[in-house]
């Protein structure tokens, strides 16, 4: 009886294993969840970011030689897919209607430490990413610009 009770509890509490297919988001329904920095914010943070001696000693001063390079790097806002599963930092210089009209151009899977990233690429360097500890696979040989529906990934235990 005790074993039966344990088995029932384990079946209801433990996550169910199995692969789930994930599709890259349609950007027409993407939502901006972060705000774009003001010019004053960028100028203020440029001074602080580029005056960090540790960064200079590591030789990481590329964006500190020109404010426009720094602005290009830091003038971004956080966006999410409509369901909140994918997110991206998108340049605030990219018009919203251009972002929302962007079509999927590629999909790939990458590892970063113990995390797996499913990276969906769009024009203008836009990349929406899904992060998970699960194992994911994607067919990188598919041309997503021709048939976006064929660009899927399979992730163990994905939402």
Positions of PLM-derived features:
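Residue-level signal for functionally critical sites in structured catalytic/ligand-binding pockets
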Residues: 3, 17, 121
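Mitochondrial intermembrane space
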Residues: 20-159
């Amino acid at each position: 009886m005790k074993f039966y009770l344990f088995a029932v509890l384990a079946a209801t509490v433990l996550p169910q294993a199995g692969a789930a297919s994930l599709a890259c988001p349609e950007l027409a329904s993407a939502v901006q969840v972060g705000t774009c920095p003001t010019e004053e914010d960028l100028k203020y943070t440029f001074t602080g970011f580029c005056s960090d001696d540790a960064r200079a000693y590591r030789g990481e001063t590329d964006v500190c030689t020109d404010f426009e390079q720094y602005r290009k790097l830091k003038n971004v806002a956080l966006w999410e897919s409509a369901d909140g599963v994918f997110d991206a930092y998108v340049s605030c210089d990219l018009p919203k209607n251009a972002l929302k009209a962007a079509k999927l151009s590629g999909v790939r899977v990458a590892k970063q430490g113990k995390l797996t990233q499913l990276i969906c690429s769009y024009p203008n360097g836009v990349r929406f990413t899904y992060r998970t500890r699960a194992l994911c696979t994607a067919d990188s040989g598919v041309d997503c610009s021709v048939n976006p529906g064929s660009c899927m990934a399979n992730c163990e235990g994905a939402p």
